[in-house]
């Protein structure tokens, strides 16, 4: 059986474990990063809050910030929008391709139309959503910290890296076998792989498990042994 590593914990994978079992893949699932809240204060006015992930939203709302009633919410993609809706937050802007930060940023800049946005983030944020905005149209606030927890991972045939920070943490204690197939959760992770001269087979347009399963099937990784 082929082994597949994904830098997410099993609790976050829904039925992906069953999918791997049905397709004769031995799953190794482990996030190599942890997160902790950071105290923050909101010091300026804003018209919109943009969440690049549900994690940013969770840490933001955990501190119960005072938000004016007319403030709109925006997010990077459908999965984040779905999770925001579960906590009662309606997204007025939803990125059409969460795995393509450049497109999300361009579309968001057009939608924003001169309004001011607040961007909650981690210490390792690349601020991709803001790249097409003038600094006068946004404020940033760190709401959580990302920490590496390196761990030795058995050699696998397939590696799925869900973020640049998980990739960085993985490489502290591991090397990628020569003929391994690499899948990146979006362009930010691909750029990190490119910078290390690591070839990437697939970049997910949308960073979802549904898209991952679809790409695994499409690329014939799941050939029966």
Regions found by a protein language model. Give the residues of each.
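Signature of uroporphyrinogen-III synthase
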Residues: 1-225
């Amino acid at each position: 059986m082929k082994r597949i590593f994904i830098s997410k914990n099993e609790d976050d994978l829904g039925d992906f474990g069953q999918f791997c079992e049905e397709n004769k893949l031995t799953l190794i699932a482990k996030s190599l990063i942890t997160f902790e809240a950071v105290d923050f204060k909101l010091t300026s006015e804003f018209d919109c809050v943009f969440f690049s992930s549900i994690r940013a939203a969770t840490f933001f709302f955990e501190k119960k910030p005072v938000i004016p009633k007319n403030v709109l919410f925006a997010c990077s993609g459908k999965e984040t929008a779905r999770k925001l809706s579960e906590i009662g937050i309606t997204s007025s802007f939803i990125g059409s391709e969460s795995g393509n930060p450049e497109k999300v940023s361009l579309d968001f800049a057009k939608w924003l139309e001169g309004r001011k946005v607040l961007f909650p983030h981690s210490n390792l944020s690349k601020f991709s959503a803001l790249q097409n905005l003038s600094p006068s149209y946004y404020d940033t606030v760190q709401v959580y910290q990302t920490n590496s927890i390196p761990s030795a991972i058995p050699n696998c045939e397939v590696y799925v890296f869900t973020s640049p920070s998980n990739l960085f943490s993985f490489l502290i204690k591991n090397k990628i076998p020569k003929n391994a197939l690499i899948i990146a959760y979006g362009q930010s992770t691909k750029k990190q792989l490119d910078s290390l001269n690591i070839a990437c087979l697939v970049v997910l347009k949308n960073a979802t498990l549904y898209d991952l399963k679809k790409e695994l099937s499409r690329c014939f990784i799941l050939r029966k042994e």
